[in-house]
Amino acid sequence: MITRRDYLKQASLAGCCLAVSGTRLFAAEAEQPITGKASLKEHGRKRGIMTGCAVGARALHDEAFQRLLAEQYDLVVSENSMKFGPLSPKPGEYNWTDADALVDFAEKHKMKIRGHNFVWHAQLPVWFKETATKDNAKKIMVDHIHTVGGRYKGKIQAWDVVNEAIQVSDGMPDGLRKSPWYELIGPEYLDLAYRTARETDPKAKLTYNEYGIEDDSEDNAKKRAATLALLKRFKANGTPIDALGIQSHIHAGTGETYGRGMRELISGAHELGLEVYLTEFDVNDDGVQDDDPAVRDKAVAAVYTDYLDIALESKAVKAVLTWGVSDRDTWLNGLKEHREKRPNRRQRPLPFDNDLKPTAPFFAIRDAFDKAPKR
């Protein structure tokens, strides 16, 4: 089987490249097996690691994408269609079309499903601002969790009950974010959300999901400390929680380092009896100066390797999900910062390229699974 080192060595040779549909594919990619026992999910299963990805509603209509999804992954999460805003166009009304389609696909292919998410400060319904008050916000939140959680009860491996509740720079007590939920209900919205979720779907793993807590920077250290403190309060108060989701939106070419901080975060969660999931993994390549796709892929793959080698040291890490499958669908291309910094260059942050062919990150992820201890 080809290794990451062999792949990157081959990818760096100009003679290995073929121009296809505006992207560069390497001979190594076409020749090496990637399905069956060579798939990401099979390499993950050997180590007891669930292998997943976020799926957009439009992508799920593509038959080639469907085949790739079923071949490579055993866990899926909806990119947007289970969020409050996309689900609820009017108060009390829900459009289940896209969410149901993903659940049906996953069940057909015997894949697990992550629910994302019940409570978040962003992507709220258009009606929320004018409708929600301090008098009715609790009912809106509880009804929403009951409605969505109840519809998919018993079908969801884990729910991101609360997403991104920490924002130290907001200056609120305990580093909590000054979100609409906080302002309308107060900090008790957190405990209420988890108790409601447990009541609604007792078998789902209840997760707290957060970003910007992974690297060794001072800002990440502050947010990491606030996150671990929140989890400790949950445990002390009897708030039902089973897992920490580390989003893992990280960067290549920027000098970010991962080591002490990641180990501190994962061990802190593990000591509280929590499982750990890497929930939204991708590697932003805007910081890589060279425009050559081979150079960028090598840089991105190196970050995947370094990050996963550290994270997967711990048997507490039970799942690795990338935020998307192929470069053609990544959300990073829509970011304002990307459009301003690299207006003529599309991101290559994921394990498959625009043509659904494996990139260097594919082999980096697969090799990282092989090196991880069995859990």
Language model segments and positions:
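N-terminal export signals
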Residues: 6-28
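Substrate-binding cleft and catalytic face of glycoside hydrolase catalytic domains
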Residues: 77-83, 98-213, 285
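Conserved, mostly hydrophobic/aromatic
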Residues: 76, 106, 159, 244, ...
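C-terminal segment of N-terminal export signals and the immediately downstream linker at the start
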Residues: 23-54
